[in-house]
Regions:
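Outer-membrane translocation/initiation segment of Type V secreted surface proteins
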Residues: 2-3, 10-24, 522-525, 532-533, ...
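Gram-negative bacterial Sec-dependent N-terminal signal peptides
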Residues: 4-5, 9-51
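Short, T/G/N/S-enriched strand-turn elements that build extracellular solenoid repeat scaffolds
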Residues: 55, 63-68, 80-95, 110-116, ...
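Extracellular beta-strand repeat scaffolds in secreted/surface proteins
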Residues: 74-76, 100-104, 119-123, 138-142, ...
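Intrinsically disordered, low-complexity Ser/Thr- and acidic-rich flexible linkers and loops
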Residues: 90-96, 193-202, 490-498, 841-859
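Extracellular beta-solenoid/beta-roll
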Residues: 323-326, 378-403, 407-546, 552, ...
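Outer membrane beta-barrel translocator domains of Type V secretion systems
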Residues: 612-797, 802-804, 808-810, 898, ...
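Outer membrane beta-barrel transmembrane domains
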Residues: 735, 818-948
Length: 948
């Protein structure tokens, strides 16, 4: 019992056993000094049985396996291997009141432990654990040593005196290294999921003590608290280190380091894609920025003894303090003055109002931004460098074109080269002379700003006009000139409108000469009859070359009415100016409501927008949607006329497949109220079944239902014969029929009711428009057969059909599209001439034993009937309005294409009984329009009829 020497004991009541036991003075606190210790019951060891809820692993003893749950305790003085712990955190994470779970005492060892939700592994001073896995909701409280702990959503709390080595922190895991504690060789894979520099301190690693040789991977985050220190940390891409305390020897291999107010970072190395950000009140000392690395020092931040290697980037302003060396020597940024700064590879220096910079070099990827009231002298701009300034700044230096300057007092600028994100704003009263705007450069002019000399816009360059602007020199445009209040690029390309409640003020750009080099001028226009737009004024000179004009229709809606007179003047040639024919052209179609607008040059050298006499291509395209859907419905219902050629006493099921060509001739087009010219194809599959077959009052009565699925695709032409677009229609139909046959005379009647859901898409070069709708149809058909000979029959027929259609309204890029209710009536008169052979199959004659009773020996033995059916179809009382327009008064245009006309139709078919209960049929037909706008085309069909 030597292990109990120098230990005092007392009697305590064990509420579990209901007895008094002898316990050490440490029992109440589980062996924790000052309230945190392990209980050891002498009675449990020597005389009383040990309960399963409280187990003790004695020194020198080894236990393997087992689970702790439901308030179980395991106190380890020896060795415990492979335990699973799911209890101990009854009072929450890292709470001193917790007394359950596994307790590793001085000299105790635990290996390969798994801690699950609600579980606690407590490692007291002198205890050690290895290879513990802690899952979500579990925790490890450490005052001893822990090696190779894995946090799979669990937590590790390293207390004073505790050492955690090789901990791996996975998703949603957290390691808290408290004051006086140490964590070495930690791998952090979580913590940064909330975004860069987000203060989500409940995952990843939080350091209040010391962290050494930490590796931070993608999504990993280390937060160094004010009292904490992190030494020799490596941060990879997607990971970051947040420093409120001290960070020493950090290496950023694509990762980020944020140095906050009061934080210090020493000897940081920023490699490719790495980024050190020093915030206000933060300090970075001896930072080395290698190629493609970045150091950012915010206003009020400090970075001293910086080594900026070639290709490294410095981002700062004259409100920060930065000192160090670059490839040209020493540089400083302090007290509102910058000297010797090199900017490249994403580097940027902001010279603020009242501050100054001298000897600044701006290389490829670098940016020098000088605020109004700021001053930069001795600037060297090389290719790819960017200057950002306005006419209130003072800047002088050299660029690829020679010397340049901006006088902040007079507002005069000369020789600027703007590229690669560079921009210059000419304020009211200012002037920019001989300006070159390169790729990704922007020249902005406020109202009252002006240009002089040669203004050159390269491909990819922009000039933005925020008011009336005058150029007394030449403009050479291979880029883009844009008036303000423009739509976004995506919206402009789709001819969308710049919507807003504020009134639009139109502006003028006046220049002596304009040379177009394939550039674009984006202008705003109102197509509501007000004849208002932005204008280009050529004053006394000439417009040559090629310039594309792109117009955006502005206002609260897409306004579109016909222009009057000469139209809307958009280019004004004044004081004897001339414009070459072909100097301007529309960069994209301009449409509003039902109209196309074209750009026209008049004899006065001015250029005007005018509405075309012909409507835009979408007018006939959308109008044809009504006709196409109704044609399909009629053909589908008409296919039933030839389904019942074989009569019998049994119910039957019929499967039909039909395809064909469908079209309408040009009969004057939409302008004359006719259906637009079109041609295309269709196809459908139809399944039909009899439900009831009976005899009533000397008549045979058959009822049934059918369903069909089909598709049609029709190319539509404009009135001038040009392609308008394509309409595609996916249709699903349900119908029912009632067939009556007078037994003695053979007089018959067929009644059909049908409904079809149409899903249509109309595609033109400029629009994709979709509409859904329902079609309804009712048909009454009758016929009376006469026998010409024993095997030849003539049957006069008459059919009346009514159909209707309703399509949803919609919107395209130029305005609304509305459909009125469509309807049409059809009368078909004709006759059917065909054989009238007995279709009784009889006995089988096949030579094959398996088919002897059900098949014929040859095709010649099959019962066969043929028929031909010529008809005249008259379409009348067709209706169907299609309206297009906008919210502008007078913009609405209504079109009512007529389907009225006469068609000659010829159908022919053949049917053969191939089994006692199976009949196959084929048919083909041709329809030709002889007057009006009725449909024409050809078709083919195959039918399988099975009786049962």
């Amino acid at each position: 019992m030597k292990r109990h020497l120098n230990t005092s004991y007392r009697l305590v009541w064990n509420h579990i056993t209901g007895t008094t036991v002898v316990a050490s003075e440490l029992a109440r606190s589980r062996g924790k000094r000052a309230g945190v210790a392990v209980a050891l019951s002498l009675a449990a060891v020597t005389s009383l049985p040990v309960l399963a809820a409280d187990t003790v692993v004695q020194a020198g003893e080894t236990v393997s396996g087992g689970a702790l749950e439901n308030h179980d305790n395991q106190i380890v003085f020896g060795t415990a291997n492979g335990m699973t712990i799911s209890t101990g955190l009854e009072y929450g994470p890292d709470n001193e009141a917790n007394t359950g779970g596994q307790w590793i005492q001085n000299g105790g060892i635990a290996n390969n432990t798994t801690v699950t939700g609600g579980g606690l592994q407590r490692v007291n001073a002198g205890g050690s654990v290895s290879d513990t896995v802690i899952r979500a909701g579990g925790g490890q409280s450490l005052q001893g040593q822990a090696v190779n702990t894995t946090l799979n959503g669990g937590e590790q709390w390293v207390h004073e005196g505790g050492i955690a080595t090789g901990t791996v922190i996975n998703e949603k895991g957290w390691q808290a290294v408290k004051s006086g504690a140490m964590a070495t060789d930690t791998v952090v894979n979580t913590g940064a999921e909330g975004g860069p520099d987000a203060e989500n301190g409940d995952t990843g690693q939080t350091v209040y003590g010391d962290a050494v040789r930490t590796t931070i991977n993608k999504n990993g985050r280390q937060i160094v608290a004010a009292e904490g220190t992190a030494n020799t940390t490596v941060v990879y891409a997607g990971g970051d280190q947040t420093v409120h305390g001290h960070a020493l020897d950090t290496t950023l291999n694509g990762g980020y380091q944020y140095v906050h107010n009061g934080g210090t970072a020493s000897d940081t190395v920023v490699n490719s894609d790495g980024w050190q950000i020093v915030k206000e009140g933060g300090l970075a000392d001896f930072t080395t920025v290698n190629q493609k690395g970045k150091l950012q020092v915010n206003a009020g931040g400090t970075a001293t003894n910086v080594t900026l290697k070639q290709g490294g980037a410095l981002v700062t302003s004259t409100a920060a303090t930065v000192t160090g060396s670059n490839r040209l020597g020493n540089f400083t940024v302090e007290n509102g003055k910058a000297d010797g700064v090199v900017l490249e590879s994403g580097g940027r220096l902001d010279v603020l109002e009242g501050h100054s910079a001298q000897k600044t070099r701006v290389d490829d990827g670098g940016t020098l931004a000088v605020s109004a009231g700021g001053k930069a002298t001795g600037v060297t701009m090389t290719s790819g460098g960017a200057l950002i300034a306005d006419s209130g700044a003072t800047v002088e230096g050299t660029n690829a074109s020679g010397r340049f300057s901006i006088d902040g007092i007079s507002g005069q600028a000369s020789g600027l080269l703007l590229e690669n994100g560079g921009s210059f704003t000419v304020n009211a009263g200012g002037q920019a002379g001989n300006t070159t705007v390169g790729h990704r450069g922007t020249l902005t002019l406020a109202a009252g700003g002006s240009l002089s000399g040669r203004t050159q816009l390269s491909k990819g360059a922009s000039m933005v006009l925020n008011g009336d602007v005058v150029s007394t020199g030449d403009i050479v445009n291979a880029g883009e000139i844009r008036f303000d209040n423009q739509t976004t690029p995506d919206a402009a390309l789709s001819r969308a409108v710049a919507k807003g409640d504020s009134p639009v003020t139109f502006h003028k750009l006046t220049t002596s000469n304009l040379t177009g080099q394939g550039g674009t001028i984006n202008m705003r226009v109102r197509l509501d009859g007000s004849n208002a737009s932005d204008q280009l004024v050529i004053n006394g000179g000439q417009a040559t070359g090629k310039t594309w004009l792109a117009f955006t229709n502005v206002g609260n809606s897409n306004l579109g009415v016909a222009t009057t007179g000469q139209g809307i003047r958009v280019v004004d040639a004044q004081n004897g100016a001339t414009t070459e024919e072909g100097a301007f052209a529309l960069s994209r179609p301009l449409q509003a409501g039902a109209f196309n607008y074209t750009l026209n040059r008049d004899s006065d050298e001015d250029w005007y927008l005018r509405s075309e006499n012909a409507y835009r291509a979408e007018v006939p395209l959308y109008a044809s949607m009504l006709t196409q859907a109704m044609d399909y419905d009629r053909i589908l219902a008409g296919s039933r006329s030839h389904q019942s050629g074989v009569s019998g006493e049994n119910n039957s099921v019929r499967l039909s497949i039909q395809g064909g060509h469908l079209g309408h001739d040009n009969n004057g087009g939409i302008a004359r109220g006719a259906t637009p010219e079109s041609n295309g194809s269709y196809g459908f599959v139809r399944l039909e079944g009899d439900l009831l077959r009976t005899e009533v009052a000397g008549m045979s009565l058959t009822t049934g239902v059918y369903g069909a699925a089909g598709h049609s695709s029709v190319d539509v032409k404009d009135d001038d014969g040009s392609r308008a677009g394509t309409v595609r229609d996916d249709a699903g139909s349900l119908g029912g029929y009632l067939n009556l046959v007078h037994t003695s005379s053979g007089l018959w009647a067929d009644i059909v009711a049908q409904g079809t859901l149409h899903s249509m898409k109309a595609s033109s070069d400029n629009n994709d428009f979709r509409a859904r709708g329902w079609g309804w149809l009712g048909s009454l058909e009758t016929g009376l057969p006469f026998s010409i000979t024993d095997n030849l029959m003539l049957e006069p027929q008459l059919q009346y059909t009514w159909q209707g259609l309703s399509l949803d309204d919609g919107q395209d890029n130029a305005g609304y599209v509305k459909f009125g209710h469509g309807s049409a009536q059809h009368v078909r008169a004709g006759f059917r001439l065909g054989s009238h052979n007995d279709m009784n199959f009889g006995k089988g004659t096949s030579s094959r034993d398996t088919l002897r009773d059900s098949a014929k020996h040859s095709v010649r033995e099959l019962p066969v009937n043929w028929w031909v059916q010529p008809s005249v179809i008259r379409t009348f009382s067709s209706r169907g309005d299609m309206s297009m327009g906008t919210a502008a008064v007078g913009s609405n245009m209504t079109f009512s294409p007529s389907q009225n006309g006469t068609t000659l139709d010829l159908q022919a078919g053949l049917e053969a009984r191939v089994r006692e209960n199976i009949t196959l049929g084929v048919q083909a037909g041709y329809a030709h329009s002889v007057s009006g706008s009725s449909a024409e085309g050809y078709n083919g069909q195959a039918t399988l009829n099975v009786t049962f």
